[in-house]
Amino acid sequence: MILGIESSCDDSSIALMDENSLKLNYFSKISQEIKHAKFGGVVPELAARLHTKALPEMIEKIKPYFSEISAIAVTNEPGLSVSLIGGVSMAKALSISLNKPLIAVNHLVGHIFSVFLDKKEIFPLGVLLVSGGHTLVLDISANGKISVLAKTGDDSFGESFDKVAKMLGLDYPGGALIENLAKNCDGNLNFTIPLLHDKRLEYSFSGLKNQVRMEIEKAGEISQSVQENIAASFQKTAIAHIMDKLSKIYEMKKWQNFAVVGGASANSALRTKLENLANKYGSTLHLAPLKFCSDNAAMIARAGVYKYNKKEFINYKNLDIVPHLNYENFKI
């Protein structure tokens, strides 16, 4: 079995996956959302302390499986440096004590494998990655080379939801709260879709966020109906922005297989728009189970299986954390 360890942000998670059947034999995740909610966002030092407490307790529970572990896969990039250290340190210690090979996994690559948890991976593949930290449109070739076709120049899709939620007086994280409010209203505010007439294939959510701020200031008192209208109008415009650029890229690439991954990929309105786009081109849309859209170790273990079969191991002395995404070395 492949042991997956994930600690790139505020979720501590481990998983055991059979490298032959892809059966998920063990999965555990401890979310820190409640701990960070009162601060309105993730506090790195607090996240690190909680990882230090949670990971050893989680590993203790899988001791009966130690003899069955073939390799240890761990997220080492990108993420909060103080959080990454927790998982990487644990993986190194286990690698030495159990004499098992180490596998370094890019967190975003892990998200890509979240749509292949129980089935063989399919490449070439188009990918929309939407999360709290990234908004990317990717093209993955048959040999696993990743090309970045579009990315955000400021806030990410998921981050913009969190910030708008905060403006509306909602708790952190705000993505699901915005989505739930939006279900009660069609959204009749005419927010401008960012970069609509700009030929550049890139995303920007800061201007839309500013439009929301001005609407809130104009409204004055924020009643339930005003909250719902702003949330629905914002979500509709943010998704329209995603689809505007993605549709242009889809027309050029005409992918047979397309995936949407990342924490924000759980948004049902976004999924519906993507299903319509895939149907238009006769593509197969790959979606992760809602449980595995957000950060988790099952996807890290699954990416680990892929790398294990290719014998992509790394010596513990050479395994370092990389807080920021290295586009030059971004590959499956």
From Swiss-Prot:
Its cofactor is Fe(2+). It is found in: Cytoplasm. Belongs to the KAE1 / TsaD family. Its EC number is 2.3.1.234. This is tRNA N6-adenosine threonylcarbamoyltransferase. Keywords: Acyltransferase, Cytoplasm, Iron, Metal-binding, Transferase, tRNA processing. GO terms for molecular function: iron ion binding; N(6)-L-threonylcarbamoyladenine synthase activity. It catalyses: L-threonylcarbamoyladenylate + adenosine(37) in tRNA = N(6)-L-threonylcarbamoyladenosine(37) in tRNA + AMP + H(+). It is an enzyme of class 2 (transferase). GO terms for cellular component: cytoplasm. Pfam families: TsaD. Substrate binds at L129, V130, S131, G132, G133, D162, G175, N267. GO terms for biological process: tRNA threonylcarbamoyladenosine modification. Required for the formation of a threonylcarbamoyl group on adenosine at position 37 (t(6)A37) in tRNAs that read codons beginning with adenine. Is involved in the transfer of the threonylcarbamoyl moiety of threonylcarbamoyl-AMP (TC-AMP) to the N6 group of A37, together with TsaE and TsaB. TsaD likely plays a direct catalytic role in this reaction. Binds 1 Fe(2+) ion per subunit. InterPro entries: ATPase_NBD, Gcp-like_dom, KAE1/TsaD, Peptidase_M22_CS, TsaD.
